[in-house]
Regions:
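Flavin (FAD/FMN) cofactor-binding and adjacent substrate-gating region
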Residues: 1-45, 49-50, 55, 63-68, ...
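Residues that act as N-cap/strand-start positions at coil-to-secondary-structure junctions
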Residues: 48, 57, 77-79, 115, ...
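Conserved beta-strand-loop-beta-strand element in the redox core of flavoprotein oxidoreductases
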Residues: 64-90
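Active-site substrate-recognition segment that forms the wall
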Residues: 84-85, 92-193
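Conserved catalytic-core segments centered on acid/base and nucleophilic motifs
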Residues: 52, 90-92
Length: 193
């Protein structure tokens, strides 16, 4: 890690407003050269090479336990054709719908999902293109949020708002919160709006 005082921070990343900064820490982490979709595709390709059967545009209609196997009814979402397969293991990766599927499958757990909405904003690139630094700040609630370079854009975020329904949307409050946080921490020619 490298430690920077405010003066050095201003020199290495001039977009940061250093008027109230005491310093910064720079450390190396990983950088995903492609986007997350390419990363997932690479993961799926590795699974295929290891012998996995994979399918796209397939919906799980039902799953039930029979002995030491899962019997899964699937539907091709393009053709509507249904078919059955078996598996030793089923990974419930349904995100906010995990509890709903567990109930449908008769699976009980000690844990329940707590819904949280996280939104990012995508804006024109805010940092220099010379370095692909991810900037991390503490927001007014002391949560970390980031400015992540992505080509000619920057991704700012995310929020973390507790919600009761997984079907949610971005609100003006979400946008206003992130814009206020980033405008207070960067020295931009014009505030982001």
């Amino acid at each position: 890690p490298r430690l920077y005082n405010a003066e050095k921070l201003e020199a290495v990343e001039p977009v940061i407003d250093t008027t109230s900064a005491r310093g910064a820490v720079q450390y190396q982490d990983c950088y995903l050269v492609d986007n997350d979709s390419r990363f997932v595709f690479s993961f799926v390709r590795s699974a295929i090479e290891a012998g996995a059967a994979v399918a796209n545009y397939v919906e799980l209609v039902s799953a039930r336990r029979e002995g030491d196997r899962w019997v899964c009814q699937l539907r091709d979402t393009d053709s509507g054709e249904e078919f059955t397969t078996t598996a030793r293991v089923v990974v419930n990766a349904a995100g906010p719908f995990v509890d709903e599927l567990n109930t449908a499958w008769g699976v009980t757990t000690d844990h329940r999902i707590v819904y949280s909405k996280g939104i990012p904003l995508i804006v024109p690139r805010l940092t220099t293109t010379r370095h692909n630094r991810v900037l991390a700040f503490f927001d007014d609630t002391q949560r970390l949020f980031y400015v992540i370079p992505m080509g000619q854009r920057s991704v700012i975020g995310t929020t973390d708002t507790r919600v009761d329904d997984p079907h949610t949307h971005v609100t003006d409050e979400d946008r206003d919160f992130l814009l206020a946080q980033i405008n207070a921490r960067l020295d931009l020619p014009e505030p982001l709006t």
